[in-house]
Amino acid sequence: MTAVGPEELRADCSRCVGICCVAPAFAASADFAIDKPAGRPCPNLRPDLRCGIHTDLRSRGFPGCTVFDCFGAGQRVTQVTFGGRDWRDDQPTAQAMFDIFTVVRPLHELLWHLTEALTMELPAPLRAALAEALAATDRLAGGDPESLRSLAVDAHRRGVVPLLAQAGDQARARGGRPGVDRRGAALLGADLRRVDLRRASLRGAQLVGADLRRVDLTGADLTGADLRGADLRGADLSGALFVHQSQLDAARGDRATGLPPRRSRPRHWAAPRRARDGSPRFPGRRPGR
């Protein structure tokens, strides 16, 4: 992994050793059916380091697993940092891999956002700063185990996040004035169907269970927005900014939901009901609205 590209920033379980099924802790909740302490393998992890219930995770009470994405950190830690070693080799190796995974994953998340920002039309000085941050972040993520374990990730993130926010603001302003600023807003369960969210800032907004049916999100910055259970049926995200696949996987949508480039329609999304004329029908909407 010598260059950062889309493939390096997407989870590839075939090149990993199931780190995300062992390293994190999770508690029994709507996202996970059981309690699991950090460092203990999930009981569903098979000897071949694949999930034994992968195709049934949602129905078996593990939707949290379906929306987790390591941004390619798992295979980098496995194949590059540890040269293909396995956490089962010995306890010191296991602990080191788990510790370093928690460092490399946020770095890879930054790499994904930086890469995404560099696809936008931005002023040359900002593009140069983003490219420099991308290279610096990749160098850090490619460090040896000792340097990674001592790395101050939060300090590095604090230097990068303002650049990403600036990129989002510049992109939102293209084609007109920026929209409403709701960054960090608590919008849990909110009915936003009649709110103009074009070119809005929804960075870090809590949109859990929000009703966004048929909402136009063109130019909206969704960096880090929590879309768990949000209703995106018929919404247009084709021109939204910084939408990660895991956000879509956590939401509800249908075939009428417009997706950004290079994103896949989650398999659990429902097909829209059809009116007699063949057009999509949306619950809660009267004809012509």
Which stretches of residues belong to each language-model region?
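Tandem repeat scaffolds
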Residues: 165, 173-289
